[in-house]
A protein has these predicted regions:
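Ligand-binding pockets and gating/stacking loops
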Residues: 1-149
Length: 149
C-alpha cells in the first residue's frame, strides 16, 4: 500500500519505497522507448499537482504532520519531461536553496500544458468552443520552447 502523501515518515518512505519505484519505473520506461526507437515520437510527462513543504514537521494546509513528514507546497515542485524532441539531460529552472520558491525560469502549470500541446503540434491558443458555444483558448499560455532541441 503506497502513497506519495508523506505527512509522516518521509525520509524512510522516500529511501525505501517512493524514490526506488519511481527511479526504476520512469528510467525503465524511457530506456525502453529509446531502445525501441519510439522515444522521439512519445512524450513522457511525470509531475504531481504540488510539491512538499521545504521543512519537515511544518503544517501548511491544516493536515497534521509528524516531525518527519512534509505538507503540501504548491509554490515550488519538480517535473520530468522526456522524448518528443525534448533536449536530453537538460535542466530547466532553479529553486532557492531550500526548494521554497523558484528563482530562475519558473514554469506555471498552464505553461506545462501549453508545452504538451506544442509537442503534439497543436497551437496552445487554438480556439475551441465550450458547451455554451463560447470560444476559449485551449490554454492561455506560451509553450516552454527552450525544452526542445
Amino acid at each position: 500500500n503506497h502513497s506519495w502523501d508523506v505527512h509522516k515518515g518521509l525520509p524512510k518512505r522516500m529511501k525505501d519505497q517512493s524514490a526506488p519505484m519511481l527511479d526504476a519505473g520512469l528510467s525503465g520506461l524511457i530506456a525502453d522507448l529509446d531502445e525501441r526507437g519510439i522515444l522521439d515520437e512519445t512524450l513522457v510527462v511525470c509531475v504531481g499537482e504540488f510539491g512538499r513543504s521545504p521543512q519537515l514537521g511544518i503544517s501548511t494546509s491544516g493536515n497534521g504532520n509528524s516531525a518527519d513528514g512534509r505538507d503540501h507546497w504548491p509554490y515550488c515542485y519538480t517535473g520530468v519531461v522526456a522524448g518528443a524532441g525534448i533536449k536530453r539531460g537538460y535542466v530547466h529552472g532553479k529553486s532557492d536553496k531550500t526548494a521554497s520558491a523558484p528563482i530562475e525560469k519558473p514554469v506555471h502549470p498552464r505553461e506545462l500544458l501549453a508545452t504538451i500541446y506544442h509537442s503534439f503540434g497543436i497551437d496552445p491558443e487554438t480556439l475551441v468552443y465550450n458547451h455554451l458555444n463560447q470560444p476559449r483558448e485551449l490554454v492561455k499560455a506560451q509553450a516552454v520552447t527552450e525544452l526542445f532541441t
